[in-house]
Each structure stands twice: as C-alpha cells, then as structure tokens.
C-alpha cells in the first residue's frame, strides 16, 4: 500500500509509504527483503518513527503525525 492510516484515539496517523521510500530508501526501515512491519506504540515512538524523524527533520511533536 502506498498510504497506510493507523487509527489512534489521539488522532489518526497517516503513513505515506511511497514518500518515505523515495526519500530514505527501503533499507532505512526494512532489514533484508522488504516486508510488512508491525508498528506498535513503542516502536513508533522510540525504535522507528520518532528516532528517524529526529535524524531527518521529520515531525516530532504529537500533532505532527496524529491528526484529529
């Protein structure tokens, strides 16, 4: 899918896979062969999204990703 929306009580998070892949390349998120990644609160806030956003000038405040 090019765009995935994660439903969340603090506001849905829309992930534009195509835009991320074009900017960062597959190996920024995927190890080995690209496959679906399970994202939970910990991985989104610590292990994956927020850490990468800090390094690549992406949004790091709640409202930057969680849209009500």
From Swiss-Prot:
Heme 2 binds at residues 20, 49, 52-53. Binds 3 heme groups per subunit. Heme 3 binds at residues 45, 62, 65-66. The keyword Lyase does not apply. One of its GO terms (biological process) is anaerobic respiration. Keywords: Electron transport, Heme, Iron, Metal-binding, Sulfate respiration, Transport. Heme 1 binds at residues 17, 26, 29-30. This is Cytochrome c3. It comes from Desulfuromonas acetoxidans. The gene is cyd.
